[in-house]
């Protein structure tokens, strides 16, 4: 049974969307891993991010399907952009991923991450990875930890 992903907590800050966009731009400019894998940030909002990647030939494993490490990197990247969207440096404290269908060369994957819970300095985020047909490829749950006193995108 598929459980729908929860929506992020409501934001009282009227500039929250602008902040999320500034963080996206600042992170992407420094994010060599995301750029090197050809990922793009398709959408950003407070506590949410959609990141896309097309499976290339050099991402295939010995079974001619996308290596799980690349799918994990995609899901982890969406998680990173979602949990940093509040402009507080936030890192992963752990994650789990389940692969439920293969991705193949040429597939356009989208990782959609949403905040499930954010309390104090810890958070929980769910990400699903879908192919271009909307078929679920993987489900990912990340746990985050927010560091003190350092913005991602200084004003």
Go through each PLM region and give its residues.
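Terminal targeting signals and extreme-terminal segments of soluble enzymes
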Residues: 2-155
């Amino acid at each position: 049974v598929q459980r729908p992903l929860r929506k992020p907590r409501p934001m009282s800050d009227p500039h929250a969307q602008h902040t999320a966009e500034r963080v996206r731009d600042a992170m992407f400019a420094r994010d060599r891993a995301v750029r090197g894998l050809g990922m793009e940030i398709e959408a950003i909002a407070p506590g949410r991010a959609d990141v896309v990647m097309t499976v290339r030939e050099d991402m295939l494993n010995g079974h001619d399907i996308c290596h799980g490490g690349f799918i994990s990197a995609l899901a982890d990247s969406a998680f990173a952009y979602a949990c940093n969207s509040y402009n507080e440096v936030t890192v992963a404290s752990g994650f789990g991923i389940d692969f439920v269908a293969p991705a193949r060369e040429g597939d356009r994957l989208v990782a959609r991450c949403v905040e499930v819970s954010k309390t104090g300095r810890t958070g929980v985020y769910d990400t699903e990875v879908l192919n271009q047909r909307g078929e679920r490829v993987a489900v990912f749950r990340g746990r985050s930890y927010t560091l003190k006193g350092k913005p991602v995108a200084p004003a």
